[in-house]
């Protein structure tokens, strides 16, 4: 068992020398433990902190539409921002795994605020059937998968 792990670590290190994993934002090589976005770029992403406010702008969008316990947007979508670049790679670049990674980042940060307390299910925003056919996946569902992986809250796509 130890030999197998050592071989995997060695092979992974060797492949990283030949094909370094790079940050999708700045292009610098990722450190061990970083996933698709380096720590510096992750820290600099424009967070809304809406999860800290009851009655935030995202929740207000749903008032009178559907029964809702909580809603938030974790990042601002600003012209020219690094988050916009990440989102475009997720939506139009076929990099659906970025959604799961971003969902895990988001859930890990929101856990300490008790944002998920009392939440029974995660419902990703549905994507129009034509867009889903073209893209091959729903980016919201991939973000929800990342959130679910950290929180253990099930996803309902029906």
Question: What do these predicted ranges mean?
Answer:
Residues 1-158:
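Glycine-rich phosphate/pyrophosphate-handling loop used in enzymes and phosphotransfer proteins
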